[in-house]
């Protein structure tokens, strides 16, 4: 069993992972309205990844014979409607998640739970990848500016992204 402080921190992070899924689902809807199917696909993969991250936490808490505690998932707040604004918010959100995962790791280290530290190492590495992936799309959007043809080409590129179920832990 995990220390109660660590259990609570895992439950808080589980909620944040579910919020991430919810946020990206809302953003996906905006791109669907804009008929940007590549961006829809990119966010669909992101939604699936966030669900997998949440389920990894869920399964880990159960495996450790600890208690799951669910709390409300906040309504997503989307700060802009353009692809650039949305991806700026995605990067900001992923940086927030990285900070949150690091805080969870801090608790695991504080209570000296080596199993949790080992488990969370995957999430730490995953966040590096998440920020890099978002940063790549964001850099392209910044280069594109108001060029609609370039946006269309990026949309065609993003349609090729596929979800690969992660092996967590």
Tell what function each PLM region has.
Residues 1-169:
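Iron-associated oxidoreductase/ferritin-like identity signal
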